[in-house]
Amino acid sequence: MNNEGSAVINEDDDTSLLVVILDCNVYSWGNREKSLQDAISGMNDDNDSSSRYNGSTTIGNNNNNNNNNNSNNNNNVNKRLINTSKNNYIGFNKFLEHFMVFINAYLMLNQENQLAIICSKIGESSFVFPQSNIDQYQQEQQELEQRQLNENGELLPTPNKTIQGQILAKLQKLDLEIKHDQTDILSSSFSASMSIALCYINRIKRETPTIKPRILVFNISPDVSSQYISVMNCIFSSQKQSIPVDSCILSQSDSTFLQQASHLTSGIYLKPQKQELLSQYLLTTFLLDTLSRKSLAYPTLKSVDYRASCFCHKRIVDIGYVCSVCLSIFCGHSSSCSTCGTKFSLKIDLRKQLNNNPTTTTSATSTVNNKS
């Protein structure tokens, strides 16, 4: 009887594991900071020019009043544009402030909640929290050297003892230098981050089978079509293990990969309209666990972009050729499948039709000659 009662309690346990994937692409965040600074500098230049214009002497009071009114109207328009850009987009430092509010609220829901943060950088991914044993030992040694005494001769506590201090200290030590031998220099390793997150969840579930895991992705970089296969494998793995993938899009354009991930895994896909209010979006949307989502209403996708990436050139295609054996997708016709090696034969009438109308493409038009 005791075992049955404990099993019921474990099933109703709301302990959750949240694995956060942060997009720390230096180029994407750098372009965001540059655009915000350019908008502010443009506003200052307009104010300087209008002030110099108003200080000059003109003939005719009517003309002077009209010019002043026009300059004031332009300033008001520029101010509205600056305020709109500030509300719609935020920088990395401001994002961390909103993110820390969300993390503290998540940990306050249940003292047994577990947290993991993975940083997706250029060409590699690494854990930000929890720290490894080596990093923790090195940090403790540095803290012992840097700790100071108070007036009573007692050691002062270090700020890195808190979770927030550990996360901020780790983010400050991130190596954001560019490696020239990389093929996709400007792209983040999102597929690697997803793989690390799934492996970490699998290890934690072995230790705590009743824990409820989910993944939250903060994305600001555009999709990389060359990572399509690996990303889709991670999405299907999450779907099979019933791990929701939530997506918070901070970029201007939507993410095709994350739309499919959130839709297939029953996660939440959200693109905040006003990023200045990001804390409210996070607390009211992404703070919901898997049990609460069954009883509460949350944002859902109206339409999902299911376009795939071709296996030959890694480009997003609307219509293409599909191998009926291994389901590989190609943007153009070929004599054989580069994935499984199956030979194709295209019908003559269809080939003539394609030659007469080269702009028309078809999907799954090839017939397969299986080798005996």
From Swiss-Prot:
Keywords noted in UniProt: DNA damage, DNA repair, Metal-binding, Nucleus, Transcription, Transcription regulation, Zinc, Zinc-finger
Compositional bias of kind Polar residues: 50-60
Biased composition (Low complexity): 61-78
Span of zinc fingers (C4-type): 323-340
Signal peptide positions (record): none
Subcellular location: Nucleus
Quaternary structure and partners: Component of the 7-subunit TFIIH core complex composed of XPB/repB, XPD/repD, gtf2h1, gtf2h2, gtf2h3, gtf2h4 and gtf2h5, which is active in NER. The core complex associates with the 3-subunit CDK-activating kinase (CAK) module composed of cycH/cyclin H, cdk7 and mnat1 to form the 10-subunit holoenzyme (holo-TFIIH) active in transcription.
Its job: Component of the general transcription and DNA repair factor IIH (TFIIH) core complex, which is involved in general and transcription-coupled nucleotide excision repair (NER) of damaged DNA and, when complexed to CAK, in RNA transcription by RNA polymerase II. In NER, TFIIH acts by opening DNA around the lesion to allow the excision of the damaged oligonucleotide and its replacement by a new DNA fragment. In transcription, TFIIH has an essential role in transcription initiation.
Protein name per Swiss-Prot or TrEMBL: General transcription factor IIH subunit 3
Organism per entry: Dictyostelium discoideum
